[in-house]
Amino acid sequence: MKKIVSILVALSLAVVAWAQNPMERSMEAFPVAKETHILCQEACALLQNNPALAPQMVVEALQGGNRQYANAVLTYADETAGAKALVKAVKKVYPSLSDASKADVLYWIGRNKLTALQKIVDEGVASQEVSEASMAAVFAAVQMGGKHNMALLDGCIKAGSPLAQEIQRLRGQVNEDDDDSTRNELRDQK
């Protein structure tokens, strides 16, 4: 009986540890290279122990070229320090990023509805070239919603922007977790 109890206790402790470690959960869902996995675990541990490192770590990760690592750092920095703590650092580093890193930042802006970084979204949507970053800017504008973004997207469609087709596609696929006001605005703008 004692052996069964000790096994159950060990199992419950393992489940609790797994539930408290978001890094482990995400690594199971998305297979990555072993060295990237180790880097992500280290970053997660550093951020959990010292959230003040988040802005610096995000900048370094975004400039580093390892996209999986950069997204993991951005996610865990967001969870530990909060998105608003990262705004200033992201705004400063954004112009020097690769197109792929800019896209990752724009998806993050859209998911977090960071109006403090609206200018970055505006510039991406106004781009006259179709790139990963400009498509992510459209996504961010749709996710953020609001009259400004809806007018921006509508203006792109009317002007015949190369992004018009992507804008219309995304307007038709608004996420179910968006609030009703965003869904209504998108529906009314069609």
Where does each model-flagged region fall?
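Sec-dependent signal peptide recognition
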Residues: 2-10
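Sec/Tat signal peptide C-region and signal peptidase I cleavage site
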Residues: 15-19
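Alpha-helical repeat scaffolds
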Residues: 58, 87-93, 119-125, 151-157, ...
